[in-house]
């Protein structure tokens, strides 16, 4: 597909009916880590986050930054190295342990008292805390509120039927003056079942528009050879910034 046409004429599907009943269990996500099917992990970090980092941080220091469905995202180390406090949640203990190992960070682990079976992993420096549990159980742990949320690979991974519940949790974690950066993918959902799931702008506005000003910072063509196996011929990533109304 001609790239110019992709950007100008790409179809926004009005809803996600075709994917709405798609469900992945937590066990299936854990199995992806075990079997190394983690194509969503970006070893060099996210290019658009790097590009718009100043817009996101606004030159502020000592921020609390939340990473939903964090995996072993290298960006967590970026923020910690800049003096910010990072909190993430991830269902895969393997993913969390790999993060600390690959970033050469020592850590402690202890049970999450409020969540049976859950664990919290903390860097020895104290500025990275990763909760190993379901995101939907996280509110029971009372993790406080955040100045920034970096949502890449989270909203697009949540089962479509859980999005409203997810958005409610995310918004409940925001402090006054928050900045929420969201990356989503645009493709033809009739050709690929997901995940990652297709999240149209109308859905984003429905989920977050009552509380947030929503601004699309950038759209980029991210189509690669691997995407042909999905049955699609284009995929566009969109970066949104949410701020307090």
Swiss-Prot record:
Substrate binds at residue 40. Its EC number is 2.1.1.67. Belongs to the class I-like SAM-binding methyltransferase superfamily. TPMT family. Monomer. SUPFAM superfamilies: S-adenosyl-L-methionine-dependent methyltransferases. HAMAP family: Thiopur_methtran. Its main location: cytoplasm. It is found in: Cytoplasm. It catalyses: S-adenosyl-L-methionine + a thiopurine = S-adenosyl-L-homocysteine + a thiopurine S-methylether. Pfam families: TPMT. It is an enzyme of class 2 (transferase). It comes from the Eukaryota. S-adenosyl-L-methionine binds at residues 29-40, 69, 90, 152. The keyword Acetylation applies. Keywords: Acetylation, Cytoplasm, Methyltransferase, S-adenosyl-L-methionine, Transferase. GO terms for cellular component: cytoplasm. It comes from Canis lupus familiaris (Dog). The modification N6-acetyllysine is found at residue 58. This is Thiopurine S-methyltransferase.
């Amino acid at each position: 597909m001609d790239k110019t046409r992709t950007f100008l004429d790409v179809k926004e599907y009005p809803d996600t009916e075709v994917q709405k009943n798609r469900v992945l269990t937590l066990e299936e996500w854990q199995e992806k880590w075990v079997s190394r099917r983690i194509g969503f992990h970006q070893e060099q970090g996210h290019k658009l986050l790097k590009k718009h980092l100043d817009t996101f941080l606004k030159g502020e220091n000592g921020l609390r930054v939340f990473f939903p469905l964090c995996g072993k995202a290298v960006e967590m180390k970026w923020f910690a190295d800049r003096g910010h406090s990072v909190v993430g949640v991830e269902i895969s203990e393997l993913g969390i342990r790999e993060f600390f190992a690959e970033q050469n960070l020592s850590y402690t682990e202890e049970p999450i008292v409020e969540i049976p079976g859950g664990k919290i992993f903390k860097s020895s420096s104290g500025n990275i805390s990763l909760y190993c549990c379901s995101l939907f159980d996280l509110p029971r742990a009372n993790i406080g509120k955040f100045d920034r949320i970096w949502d890449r690979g989270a909203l697009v991974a949540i089962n479509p039927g859980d999005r409203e519940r997810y958005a409610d949790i995310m918004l409940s974690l925001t402090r006054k003056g928050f900045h929420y950066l969201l990356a989503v993918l645009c493709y033809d959902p009739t050709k690929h079942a997901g995940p990652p799931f297709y999240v149209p702008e109308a859905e984003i506005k429905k989920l977050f528009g009552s509380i947030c000003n929503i601004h699309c910072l950038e759209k980029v063509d991210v189509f690669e050879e691997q995407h042909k196996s999905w049955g699609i011929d284009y995929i566009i990533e969109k970066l949104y910034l949410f701020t307090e109304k």
